[in-house]
């Protein structure tokens, strides 16, 4: 390597662990940041992207992440030991440092930064839990509803303009994933 060349791109694989013989299943087009941790029965769909320092721990039930869904930096996703697994649909955005536990996030759901979604909760298609919101056990956010607070409560149904704004997040992260896949490399001063 000459002084002017950069190291080759990092092959993104994250830290992957089997648990009791069950390994993560990662679609070839999904992307996992090198510092993300996936344990056990984690299933990533096409184009799903898991960012830096996320932990997805599927030790007692599966975690399913749908196509093009983005799990942003520092998020923790887990399951419970009963009936509740974590089911994340297609085109879902989960903001930085969220906690998602044994719940269902339907297609195009949006979970804000630092928000928490607890066991048995459901966020229907296009539903939004704002940053630092707390969706309590068993609660349901309806289609295109905006919820906030701790505990979270419904504020209103989002307008078409608001929905369009949130819908920009998924293509942004798909594009960013492609840039990281091609351009992330190690560096030492």
Place the predicted regions along the sequence by residue.
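Glycine-rich hexapeptide-repeat left-handed beta-helix
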Residues: 1-25, 59, 65-67, 73-88, ...
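N-terminal segments that cap or nucleate solenoid repeat domains
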Residues: 11-50
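Generic short beta-strand segments
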Residues: 35, 53, 73-74
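Short proline/glycine- and basic residue-enriched helix-capping loop/turn segments at helix->loop/beta transitions
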Residues: 93
